[in-house]
Structure formats: C-alpha cells, structure tokens
Amino acid sequence: MKQKIILWIGALLLLTAGTGCEKNKDYEVPTQLTGTRWELAGIVDAKTGKITPLAPKGCYGFKFISETEAKGGTVLNQMTVHLTTPPFIGIVTMIGDEENGDAALFYRIIKTLESYTWEKNELKFFYDNKQYYLLYKYSKP
C-alpha cells in the first residue's frame, strides 16, 4: 500500500511539473499590427536561409499607424508601407542618400516586391519570384 501511495504521489508530481513547463519565448508576438514597430534584419535567401544585413544597421524601420499602413524611414528619407497585394513600400522624401550604406540596394528591392507574410514576430516582403525577401523583426517599443 505504501508503495502505491509513493507511486501515485510521484506520478502526480511529474504530471503537474510537466504541464507547467512551456518554452520561454525570447520575443513577444504582436496580436495586431497597429502601433507595432519593425526593424529590418536583412535580406534573406529563401533557399539557404542566409541573412545579409543592410548597412547602416537600424536605418530601415517603420511603425504601423493602422493594420495596413506604416510610416518609417531609411538613412535620410521617410517611407510609407502599405500591406496590399502586392505590398508597397514607397519613399516619401527623396534626399540623395543612395551613397549611404546599402540604401541604393534597398530602393531597388522595394520597387520589385511581390508579396508579404506576417508570422509571429516576423514580417517578410518577397521579391525575385520569392527567391529572396526583406526580413523585418518586431521591435519592442
């Protein structure tokens, strides 16, 4: 009888310990886009998963003002983002910052966007027949 009680207590402890264990997330997952901020992590090769960051770091971000529209900036310019099909990222001001880091490359890419996806803390803008995408990561305010 004593052995059964110990077995039941052990099973109960394992059961309660197992249900309380959830992997800790090292990021937050936004439930809506309005008010969220996103920073460019880089260009991703969809086949290999290799990320190539764009310079200067931290200069290609935006914040959503509605569920489908965001405002942000590049090195020197302001930009708008519209989650349409296809998505649209447009440069509002046109100050010549194409010599700054990878701004010229960024400007070429945003003219060719085909689609986008939003999954958890990642926003992906695909181009070149979905072979590459701009990877944006959710940034805590």
Curated annotation (Swiss-Prot):
Membrane topology value: Lipid-anchor
Subcellular location: Cell membrane
Entry GO terms, CC: plasma membrane
Name of the protein described by the UniProt record: Putative lipoprotein Tanf_09445
Keywords: Cell membrane, Lipoprotein, Membrane, Palmitate, Signal
Lipidation (N-palmitoyl cysteine): 21
Signal sequence extent: 1-20
Domain of life: Bacteria
Main location class: membrane
Lipidation feature positions (S-diacylglycerol cysteine): 21
Claim: Signal is one of the keywords in the record: yes
